Amino acid sequence: MGLSDGEWQLVLNVWGKVEADVAGHGQEVLIRLFKGHPETLEKFDKFKHLKTEDEMKASEDLKKHGNTVLSALGGILKKKGQHEAEIKPLAQSHATKHKIPVKYLEFISEAIIQVLQSKHPGDFGADAQAAMSKALELFRNDIAAKYKELGFQG
């Protein structure tokens, strides 16, 4: 299920575009997540009160959290699958503290793909989309395996 060197290069090339504005990309990813899957908003006490897209866009906390999420993901992607050290604490907190189901990680993966498609169409063609989907699936599978070790049925 691993990615080839060429696939990782496609992933990291488009991720370079994300790094020009991590917070902006992260905010847009979270807005898409919450709009597409409103049930996910219930996991975020800090954002539950945000009902409209305008409220979400105006929230500095949402932007800050988007930055946190995509910064962590960027660090994981740069490990090209050798991300055990990064995955372990993330799985621990998301299983025991936040109780985030793997399904929600699928939802945010979809949102990431959609944001990259809309913001970087020239750098995110079919090959790059397939590579990113594969990288995000690898991440989710590894998180799910850690969840299982922790006894979390997410």
From Swiss-Prot:
Its EC number is 1.7.-.-, 1.11.1.-. InterPro entries: Globin, Globin-like_sf, Myoglobin. One of its GO terms (biological process) is removal of superoxide radicals. O2 binds at H65. Belongs to the globin family. One of its GO terms (molecular function) is oxygen carrier activity. GO terms for cellular component: extracellular exosome; sarcoplasm. The gene is MB. The modification Phosphothreonine is found at T68. Keywords: Cytoplasm, Heme, Iron, Metal-binding, Muscle protein, Oxidoreductase, Oxygen transport, Phosphoprotein, Transport. Residues 2-148 form the Globin domain. It comes from the Eukaryota. The modification Phosphoserine is found at S4. Heme b binds at H94. Monomeric heme protein which primary function is to store oxygen and facilitate its diffusion within muscle tissues. Reversibly binds oxygen through a pentacoordinated heme iron and enables its timely and efficient release as needed during periods of heightened demand. Depending on the oxidative conditions of tissues and cells, and in addition to its ability to bind oxygen, it also has a nitrite reductase activity whereby it regulates the production of bioactive nitric oxide. This is Myoglobin.
